[in-house]
Structure formats: C-alpha cells, structure tokens
Amino acid sequence: MPNELRIGRVYRHFKGDFYLVEAVANDSETGEPFVVYRKLYGDGGLWLRPLAMFLSPVDKTKYHDAAQEYRFELQEIPSAAGH
C-alpha cells in the first residue's frame, strides 16, 4: 500500500519521533505542495517539508538499519477513553 497523507493525524519519523500533520501549503512561485507539521515533543515547533519528500521511502542505502519503509508513517493511536 502506498504511503498517503492525512491532515490532523500523527506520523512517526523513521528516526523515532512523532509529528502532527497540520496542513498542506503550496509554494507561491512553483506551486509545489509542502507538508506543515508540528513536532509532538520539546517546544512543539512547526516544520515544513516537500510533500514528495515527506511521503518518500527511507533511503536504505544511507539508513540501512531503519525499521520503517517510509520517512514518515501514519500512526493509529487508540483512544485512552476507549472510543
């Protein structure tokens, strides 16, 4: 199954940290789509990355020990309240 982007959902970066996808924004000059995402640790800062790169496979040549197939992968987080 190909990787897909879902706004408002949590993704895990292949190095282990978690991020919330806030939006997709387009570059005003090129129209290239970028993912706007917030880190779910530390200061909760916002980050921006090209959509194609966000959804790309991990470079297994460079990161041969990476467990994930994709750079960012959607996480299914169960409700603490049981919903």
Task: Spell out what each predicted region is.
Residues 1-83:
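Mixed-charge, low-complexity intrinsically disordered regions
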